[in-house]
């Protein structure tokens, strides 16, 4: 995600968009815990966890945009409504509103035994751009597709033992499937969940899920190789504190890129340096927001 926002070329952008946002919804479903609380209580819990960071960091960037480009109501209207269109700087916060509605919908459908509705809702999300004249507010189109991915993630977790071969593929098989997956992704059109673009829908689902399962196996191989190292602990912290990275990465990249432009860093290495410096700063921010009283800003 951070590399995508730094920008490493059109091909890289196309490849990661095929799976990186689907992966966030899948992972959220994989980590989902069954709750006995009522829907109202759940809404309150999820609003604190997801909507407080959404409005804090989205609002902060709207204020900053007003300071830089002049006061305008458009960023605020989009923050409160069409949040996939234009939220300045930290546009990625759309995911928080999408995940909020995905989690509420999933819990409601499972609570009232309407799980079968997940499939038509996910299909509607894939077709929303073609069926509707305007994007749905609050990233609801992406939320509908995310509901299907969330379900797959949770079902994968429940069936982890029976899916052990799929979730623990050997390195050689992973590399072969990576080549196949890359070819399929490049064969398909451009994918962007935020913009409700899915090109060939069956191929979108195949590519997204294949990428995710390859990623799970590779992550286990990498973790085993890096066991008990600082890098392993750092990577775990990125996943644990991912909301900080979602909310802050574009803001950090914005200032780091502006600084590099000011000092005249060579173009050949600029993107790599921006990525490295941004990740260091983001790690510092994750420590700040998770270990101090500022944790309320990220819904803790």
Regions found by a protein language model. Give the residues of each.
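Alpha-helical transmembrane segments and their immediate juxtamembrane cytosolic regions
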Residues: 1-300
């Amino acid at each position: 995600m951070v590399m995508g926002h730094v920008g490493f070329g059109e091909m890289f952008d196309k490849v990661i968009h095929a799976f990186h946002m689907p992966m966030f919804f899948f992972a959220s479903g994989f980590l989902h815990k069954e709750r006995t609380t009522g829907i109202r209580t759940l809404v309150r819990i999820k609003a604190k966890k997801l909507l407080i960071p959404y409005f804090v960091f989205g609002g902060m960037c709207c204020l900053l945009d007003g300071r830089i480009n002049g006061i305008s109501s458009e960023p605020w209207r989009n923050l409160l409504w069409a949040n996939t269109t234009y939220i300045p700087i930290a546009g990625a916060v759309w995911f928080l509103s999408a995940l909020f509605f995905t989690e509420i919908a999933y819990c409601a459908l499972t609570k009232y035994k309407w799980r079968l509705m997940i499939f038509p809702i996910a299909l509607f999300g894939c077709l929303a751009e073609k069926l509707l004249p305007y994007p749905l507010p609050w990233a609801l189109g992406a939320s509908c597709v995310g509901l299907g991915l969330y379900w797959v993630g949770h079902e994968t977790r429940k069936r982890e033992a029976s899916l052990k071969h799929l979730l623990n593929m050997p390195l050689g098989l992973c590399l072969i499937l990576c080549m196949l997956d890359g070819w399929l992704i490049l064969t398909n059109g451009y994918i962007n969940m935020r913009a409700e673009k899915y090109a060939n829908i069956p191929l979108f689902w195949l590519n997204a899920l294949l990428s995710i399962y390859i990623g799970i196996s590779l992550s286990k191989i990498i973790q085993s190789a890096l066991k008990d190292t600082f890098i392993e602990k750092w990577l775990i912290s990125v996943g644990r504190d991912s909301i900080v990275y979602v909310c802050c990465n574009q803001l950090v990249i914005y200032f780091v890129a502006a600084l590099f432009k000011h000092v005249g860093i060579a173009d050949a290495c600029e993107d790599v340096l921006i990525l490295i410096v941004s990740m260091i700063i983001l790690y510092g921010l994750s420590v700040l927001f998770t270990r101090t009283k500022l944790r309320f800003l990220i819904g803790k």
